[in-house]
Amino acid sequence: MNQKALKSLEYYKIIDQLTEKASSQMGKDLCRHLLPSEDVYEIRHMQTQTRDALTRLFQKGNISFGSVKDVRGSLKRLEIGSSLGISELLAIAGLLENTNRVKAYSRNERGDAREDSLDGMFESLEPLTPLSAEIRRCIISQDEISDDASAGLMHVRRSMKVANDRIHTQLASLVNGSARNYLQDSVITMRNGRYCLPVKAEYRSQVQGMIHDQSSTGSTLFIEPMAVVKLNNDLRELGSKEKEEIEHILDTLSELA
């Protein structure tokens, strides 16, 4: 069918209306690229599919695809051996979980023994439940990987907690003891990824350590006491190991996808 005929029939206006009804970006893209068939057998088959789809909708209600993210770019990256990030893996897990819900929309679930033209389409769906479950087990949210994602990550994070506790114990003893009178506030703060104390500038020589920052007025120096320099170094090294372990976890999940 030529473009002139399509315009005369206002075909693209119909496509625009259909596209607005699609709840996912991938669905919208499919709608935009639909073209009418000129094959009478294909037309009859698609009409049968439309009728069967309406029957399912009337019997069981609508299927939601609104939560589905566009993962086509991620799948292309996997094809060339790239590893995916947290948000990409969560999007794939969400798609697979939605696939599982859609598959439950089968003929047997409707309690209807009659076969229809959509059965094969639903039966071909593979939710890959073990993969989505593993992604959810390892990734808690966009910003957090579970401690249980790997034995290595759990070990590193336990070591980080021990190091953090030791640093806070050392600094608390200074805040409540020998450095008490030299501090602007009795708080432990962080500067450049290092735990520091807010020392009054005039008492700089009374607190041995490294200056990492100062207040806008210059009245407060943020000093990392010598007593915690090695502990801070250990903590930073553990932080690097944590990042490496997380990258390894994401690599492993990407290989499974």
Regions found by a protein language model. Give the residues of each.
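Internal alpha/beta scaffold segment
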Residues: 226-252
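Extended, Lys/Arg-enriched charged tracts that mediate electrostatic binding to polyanionic substrates
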Residues: 154-203
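SMC-family hinge/dimerization module
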Residues: 187, 191-222, 232
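Signal for well-folded cores of large energy- and translation-related assemblies
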Residues: 19, 76, 140, 168, ...
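A short alpha->loop->secondary-structure connector
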Residues: 110-114, 214-218, 239
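Charged, surface-exposed helical/loop "interaction arms" that form contiguous linear patches used
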Residues: 144-159, 244-257
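Coiled-coil heptad-register positions
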Residues: 58, 107, 114, 171, ...
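Conserved amphipathic alpha-helical "coupling/scaffold" segments
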Residues: 1-152, 156
